[in-house]
Amino acid sequence: MREITSLPTLLVEPIVRAALVEDLGRAGDITTAAVVPKEARFSGAMVARRPGTIAGTEAARIAFDLVDPTLDVSILQPDGSVVEPGQPVMHIKGPAQSVVTAERTALNFISHLSGIAT
């Protein structure tokens, strides 16, 4: 795997923040707040659906961090990694409401950027 130089967080964070604002609007994630118990915890992996090259992991991590800095996010396959279906890319652990609130934005970045990288 060729080493990939990441963009500085200073450049990526405003884009991720704007995506979260667009996704959540003024009211926030009211569906998650209504359906997922506040005390529920989550621990799981984001896995590759198709073979390809991973990109956007830092943007995804920032999305989780902006929603809830207490989330434990581990990048298992850094940008530039070639993955097969079912291979874990990230592991996320923490309050379920926070994970569900950030996941759509995080997945959008990884899906779109990995598609381009592949």
What is each PLM-predicted segment?
Residues 2-118:
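Acidic/glycine-rich phosphate/pyrophosphate-binding loops and surrounding catalytic core
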